[in-house]
Design a protein with these regions (language model features):
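Nucleotide-activated chemistry modules centered on ATP-dependent adenylation/adenylyltransferase
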Residues: 2-185
């Protein structure tokens, strides 16, 4: 494992490291970053391609905490998928539920202050709790270019406002490439 100074160096030279990692595969990126991380976490919403990142990270190191902010509004299919992943891969699933509960009838429309409060209550509050509990130095995520305008401004490596190194090993991959990866296991 690299020293804290080496991780600080990577954070201070993100552009150089992003350029260096651009033509590397996810396994290489994950292995390289794990060599400098003492407290990595992995996040998932158990969406269509989430197994790719969970599989790739767990191949490199067992037992990394997998943070799942369970909003309480998941489909049975998502719950079954999460259970299947937990049973088949060497992960340490950490499920965080919102402190505040909402019923279906309380769901706000997708705009305005009520919606922002809802998002804060069911997504951000549990995630902030997870970050406080795990105090990660590295956060593996499956965000990709082309998903949102904001995500298009990021890269393989980026920094959160809290200084956590955010790593997106599949950042430049297409849906087709991810389907191909998933078909291998």
């Amino acid at each position: 494992i690299m020293t804290d100074d080496q991780l600080l160096y990577i954070k201070a030279h993100l552009d150089e490291y992003n350029e260096m990692l651009r033509d590397k595969g996810p396994e290489h990126i994950i292995r390289f970053i794990l060599s400098s991380s003492k407290r990595p976490i992995l996040t998932s919403n158990f969406g269509p391609y989430s197994a790719s990142l969970i599989h790739a990270v767990s191949k490199q190191r067992n037992g990394i905490p997998l943070i799942w902010c369970d909003t309480g509004f998941n489909t049975q299919q998502t719950l079954n998928f999460a259970k299947r992943i937990e049973q088949s891969l060497p992960i340490d699933l950490k499920r965080y539920k919102p402190s505040k509960k909402y019923s279906e009838s309380e769901l706000p429309s997708e705009s305005g202050e009520a919606f922002q409060n809802f998002v804060n209550d069911v997504k951000l509050e549990p995630f902030k709790r997870a970050l406080a509990e795990h105090n990660p130095d590295v956060w593996f995520t499956n965000i990709r270019r082309g998903q949102t305008a904001y995500r298009d401004t990021l890269d393989i490596l980026s920094l959160t406002s809290d200084g956590i190194l955010k790593v997106s090993p599949f950042y430049f991959w297409t849906d087709t490439e991810l389907r191909g990866y998933l078909s291998q296991f």
